[in-house]
């Protein structure tokens, strides 16, 4: 696959909400923060990486060996609708639906899909909220 630079996908809010098609990743995730130098050693394992002035944030799978040691586990819900990076309003509608139920959400937009990170223990509530979201 070559490198693509234009933003493919849907931009119409009604079409986006009608086709969200959320999918739960069965593996818990964790957010890590490390110095830029230390983060380089974990990048191959990272689902997502973002550099900030203070260091690098990584989202990684939680290993079964250290599952019990986590303070906060996160579930990833992928919105399988192919949304454009230029789409307006979809994440606002999704965030509002989750906020109405008191579910924290950390969204990440990738090139083809959007991903929601919600507390692991609220993952089923989040899926239910998304299933009731209407255009």
Task: Give short role names for the model-derived ranges.
Residues 1-97:
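Regulatory modules associated with amino-acid/nitrogen control
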Residues 45-47, 102-107:
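A short linear hydrophobic-aromatic micro-motif
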Residues 50-53, 123-135:
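Charge-rich, low-aromatic oligomerization/scaffolding segments with amphipathic character
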Residues 62-65, 119-125:
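Helix N-cap motif at beta-to-alpha junctions
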Residues 75-82, 106-108, 134-135:
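Conserved short beta-strand edge segments in small beta-sheet-based binding/regulatory domains
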Residues 94-97, 101-103, 129-133:
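Generic non-transmembrane alpha-helical segments
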Residues 109-113, 122:
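Structural preference for solvent-exposed beta-strand-turn elements
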Residues 116:
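Phosphate/ribose-phosphate-bearing ligand recognition and processing surfaces
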């Amino acid at each position: 696959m070559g490198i693509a630079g234009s933003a493919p996908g849907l931009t119409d809010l009604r079409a986006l909400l009608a086709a969200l098609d959320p999918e739960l990743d069965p593996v818990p995730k964790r957010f890590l923060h490390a110095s830029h130098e230390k983060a380089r050693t974990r990048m191959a394992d990272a689902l997502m990486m973002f550099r900030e002035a203070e260091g690098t944030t990584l989202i990684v799978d939680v290993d079964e060996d250290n599952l019990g040691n986590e303070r906060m586990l996160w579930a990833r819900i992928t919105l399988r609708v192919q949304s454009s990076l230029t789409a307006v309003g979809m994440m606002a509608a999704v965030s509002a639906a989750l906020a109405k139920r008191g579910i924290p959400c950390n969204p990440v937009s990738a090139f083809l899909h959007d991903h929601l990170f919600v507390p692991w223990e609220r993952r089923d509530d989040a899926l239910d909220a998304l299933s009731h979201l209407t255009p």
